[in-house]
């Protein structure tokens, strides 16, 4: 059974994407900082007959992210699909934020994605297979000064994806992002649509691999 690891598993795109892969027979591992909320999501999945486990992770802490991936690889044998969905959404301009919150936001919004990608590619490279899915944002295309730390983070997600796409493809790893350019509520048609796009990216044959899809298109 293949394993899908979600980092930053919220009730919107995180849950919808995990459920989409669960329908295809994946073992799901949901992870976030708040284990109570994550367990509720896992219970919803189990009620539908899906396999779902819960882990706690601090996406701002590189050691926490790397330890999570190593634990999942040891327990289930592999991480076949990684979905990095963690984000710190703070409405504040650069001048309104103290240095500590800027760095904290960036640690979640891009730092955790960098660490997760680096950690998971080692075993994926040995297998010459794997998918890394990153939740992007329209702020990477049109930055907003009122959400400056998120804008920088989503720009980083896009750069990480496009900057590693070809090199990872040569190792059999598909890294891709859905650049989400609208607000997405839990249990919404939009969340389901984004999940479907992530599944589409994962399902592409290697000669059709793409790095980015924008939603809505």
Language-model features: locations:
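Rossmann-fold cofactor-recognition segment
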Residues: 45-63
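Catalytic loop of short-chain dehydrogenase/reductase
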Residues: 105, 131-156, 162, 169, ...
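Active-site loop of short-chain dehydrogenase/reductase
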Residues: 78-79, 124-136, 170-173
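Conserved glycine-rich Rossmann-like NAD(P)H-binding loop of the short-chain dehydrogenase/reductase
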Residues: 26-40
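Conserved glycine-rich cofactor-binding loop
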Residues: 10-11
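C-terminal helical subdomain
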Residues: 170-217
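Catalytic Tyr-X3-Lys loop
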Residues: 88, 95-114, 157
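Amphipathic alpha-helical dimer-interface segment in Rossmann-like NAD(P)H-dependent oxidoreductases
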Residues: 108-126
């Amino acid at each position: 059974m293949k394993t899908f690891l979600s980092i930053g598993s919220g009730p919107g795109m995180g849950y919808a994407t995990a459920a989409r892969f669960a329908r295809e027979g994946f073992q799901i591992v949901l992870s976030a900082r708040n284990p109570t909320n994550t367990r509720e999501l896992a219970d919803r999945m189990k009620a539908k007959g899906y396999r779902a486990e819960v882990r706690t992770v601090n996406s701002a802490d590189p050691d926490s992210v790397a330890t999570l991936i190593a634990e999942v690889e040891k327990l289930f044998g592999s991480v076949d699909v990684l979905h990095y969905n963690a984000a710190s959404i703070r409405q504040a301009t650069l001048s309104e934020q103290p240095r500590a919150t800027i760095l904290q936001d960036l640690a979640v919004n891009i730092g955790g994605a960098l660490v997760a990608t680096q950690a998971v590619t080692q075993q994926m490279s040995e297998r010459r297979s794997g998918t890394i899915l990153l939740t992007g944002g329209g702020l990477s295309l049109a930055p907003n000064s009122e959400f400056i730390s998120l804008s920088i983070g989503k720009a980083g997600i896009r750069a990480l994806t496009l900057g590693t796409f070809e090199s990872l493809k040569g190792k059999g790893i598909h890294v891709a992002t859905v650049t989400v350019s609208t607000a997405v509520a839990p249990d919404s048609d939009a969340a389901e649509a984004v999940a479907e796009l992530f599944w589409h990216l994962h399902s592409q044959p290697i000669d059709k691999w793409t790095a980015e899809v924008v939603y809505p298109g």
